[in-house]
Amino acid sequence: MKIAYILLAHNNPSQLKRLVDSLKNTGDFYIHIDKKSDIRPFKQVFEGMESVHLLEKRVKVSWAGWSMVVGYMLALQAALENEKNYERFVMLTGQDYPLMSNEEIIKTFEDNRDVEYIMAYNIVTSSVPTDKNKILKRWYLDNPFRSRFLQRAYKGIMYRVVTRPFSGKELRVPLNGKLVDPYFGQMLSAFTRKGAELLMDTYLHDKKYNKKMKTVFAAVEIYWQTLFFNSELRQNTVQHGEEHEITEHFGWAPLHYHHYYVDTSVFTEEDFDELKDCGYMFCRKMVVGKSEGLMDKIDEMRREK
């Protein structure tokens, strides 16, 4: 099983190195470092590691902005173009950490070669009132400024002038020449090569879809979700189609254990017992200065498996 890990990261090179080391010998890593960040410390920690590919082409990434999609697509494109012909493409962030052993990770993917690890629900039929605003309002979340003061000012102005007063009427989005229902789910997914090629082909060629996705809220949680659940691959997903109701443990991330409903959502050593038996492949998020003890315990657990 040839695995390519597709990552976005922006800080803490040592933590990213620890994540990569924990998955050593399971696959290769294609990493987009936020253009706002100095890439030199990342190059230093990964010097001599042939399995790690730090992208030369980078963009400035803003939370929930279209730029997050672009960052992932640049990394995915590099992996697809590699002559190794990868069979599985796993999307991660620099704050993730594996819970399964490397042997378990490989076996899971080998035993489920045709499964698209993605989950989502239909925004049109969603019972959550704010879901529809992700599509109906125009969001401009890619911030051109470095200064936090200017970032806050830009965000406030764009919301007051563009987002709040504007509301469209069409919930469906243009995809492959027709209007389809949009879907929402976690960005962290894992695709077969067929799925990854479908995603890349859409990104490179469907201009109307891309134009619409540039103004939705958190495109990275709508872009491939809408694509997959309006394609023939929807029956190959972990739920064999969309989720039909909002569950108590929000997540829609088939491989990641994540307290999505908690603002801080940082795991610490106190969470070890909860994580060790959760059954997920990965967890997020880990933060330097808070999660080292937990990662030490997870490392020990993974060695014993």
Regions found by a protein language model. Name each.
Residues 1-305:
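ER/Golgi luminal nucleotide-sugar-dependent glycosyltransferases, focusing on the catalytic module
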